[in-house]
Amino acid sequence: MPPEGLSAKEHELAHSERVEEYLRRVAREGGFPLLMPDHVPNTHLALTLGEWARDAGEERHVATHRAIFDARYGRGLDLGSRQVLLGIAASLGLDTQDISRAWDERRFDERLGQFRHLALYLGVAATPAALVCNELLIGSRPYQVLSDALGRCMVTPASAESGD
């Protein structure tokens, strides 16, 4: 991915009409705004920000994840932009100077590389993806699919024998 990102249409990366309509419907039903910008950002800086926040604690990590998601899909902002990401970090009270240093030092590159290698090993070819026990679910899935996978995961020999 080039640092400036790329066009989804030009590189045939856009969602299918069916998937896009499903995502829009789910967002509408949940009361969430959903923009689908053509620009696909290089998200390395955003992922680094997320890892910085993970190390700062669960509460900050969750808040940062939500703010990044809202910036992209709620407001259509470029997650490859340092200014956008520093604005997100500042709005959450995060240490923007240390985050800038983390980017410059490539502090979380090894960790992000390990996540990427694990995803490739598991066969993740697209996002979103969820690994539920030994079942890999790739792509946007209805709630019931995830619920059913969790149900299968929760079956133990004892519960199978008792019928629970």
Predicted regions and their residues:
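C-terminal cap of thioredoxin/glutaredoxin-like
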Residues: 59, 63, 67-164
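Structural alpha/beta surface segment adjacent to cysteine/selenocysteine redox centers
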Residues: 1-75, 161
